Design a protein with these regions (language model features):
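Membrane-embedded alpha-helical bundles of multi-pass transporters/translocases
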Residues: 2-314
Length: 315
């Protein structure tokens, strides 16, 4: 019994730290990369914004293609698990390179930033999409799936909170007043940890369930999705939600740096913005057991909209 419990928790923690790894890099991108480009690397804000828009659009296509790759993958390690091993080292390396300032002119820096950011986004897709798709292959037990998801949420939120709270203090400590060096060394810390944890995750999880399905082509997938109106409505909603998320997180550092004039508040607010949603996430299963999921979503959206309205009104 003890061995079974040990094996279960080994997989649970192995599954969860993969999300922790992804969030170490994801939070660095969403919270600090734009600020790094404009205020540390010295790139024009217009071109940085355009670069982020283009990369996000390309990344959306890459997500769909990665799903098709997973559907057509068959190895001795399973369908999803191999990509944690394949992507671990390049993922951490590109995180580091994205926060490096090369000795180029403005045009050279723009090209360097675009290439490294685009490659980092591809590598995030390479490890994160398979990780997100992995759960059905780990177990058939619905309770164990719930436990795995809970551990993932907890550790993923921990990773996001660590980056939100620790990044700017690390930049100051490691850079000793030089933001260029500080961001680079901080990226080295998070990149190395992310790579290590992805390798540990690969080592400690196993795809125990074999799901047989017909191979899917891009054309067949598009025909199927085109006929699915609820999917299109939900996809538009997700697009708008993530657009708002990137706008808020990208502006957070600028807001406290230029408008409030207190950089220390950035870590506090960014940390709370990753921890507080965790409480909401943990209440969803309880609410979903008492209400229709659609109603839960509508109520939560209404609360969020009202909160944003009040916040913007005060500002």
């Amino acid at each position: 019994m003890a061995e079974t419990t040990f094996t279960l928790w080994r997989q649970r923690l192995g599954y969860g730290i993969a999300d922790l790894s992804c969030n170490l890099v994801w939070q660095m991108i969403s919270l600090y990369l734009m600020f790094f480009y404009t205020d540390v690397m010295g790139l024009p804000a217009y071109y940085v914004g355009l670069m982020f828009l283009v990369t996000r659009l390309v990344d959306g296509v890459a997500d769909v293609l990665m799903g098709l790759v997973i559907d057509n993958t068959a190895t001795r390690w399973g369908r999803c698990r191999p990509y944690l091993l394949i992507g671990a080292i390049p993922f951490g390396l590109l995180c580091i390179l994205a926060f490096y300032v090369p000795d180029f002119g403005t045009t050279g820096k723009l090209i360097y930033a675009f290439v490294t950011y685009l490659c980092l986004s591809f590598l995030y897709t390479l490890v994160n999409i398979p990780f997100c798709a992995m759960l059905p292959f780990l177990t058939n037990d619905s309770r164990e799936r719930t436990t795995l998801s809970a551990v993932r949420i907890l550790l993923g939120s921990l990773g996001a909170t660590i980056v939100a709270v620790a990044t700017l203090p690390l930049v100051g400590a490691l850079g000793k007043g030089n933001q260029e060096h500080g961001f680079f060394y901080t990226a080295v810390v998070f990149g190395v940890i992310a790579t290590f944890f992805l390798l540990v995750s690969f080592r400690n999880i196993k795809e125990n369930i074999s799901i047989t399905q017909e191979r899917m082509t891009l054309k067949r997938a598009w025909v199927s999705l085109r006929a699915n109106r609820p999917w299109f409505v939900f996809a538009i909603n997700i697009f708008l939600m993530w657009g708002a998320f990137f706008f808020q997180t990208g502006a957070l550092v600028y807001f406290f740096h230029y408008y409030v004039g207190n950089n220390d508040l950035t870590a506090i607010v960014a940390g709370s913005s990753t921890f507080v949603p965790l409480l909401g996430t943990l209440t969803v299963p309880l609410l979903a057991s008492r209400m229709k999921k659609r109603h839960v979503y509508l109520v939560a959206s209404a609360i969020n909209l009202r909160s944003e309205e009040r916040r913007v009104g005060k500002e």
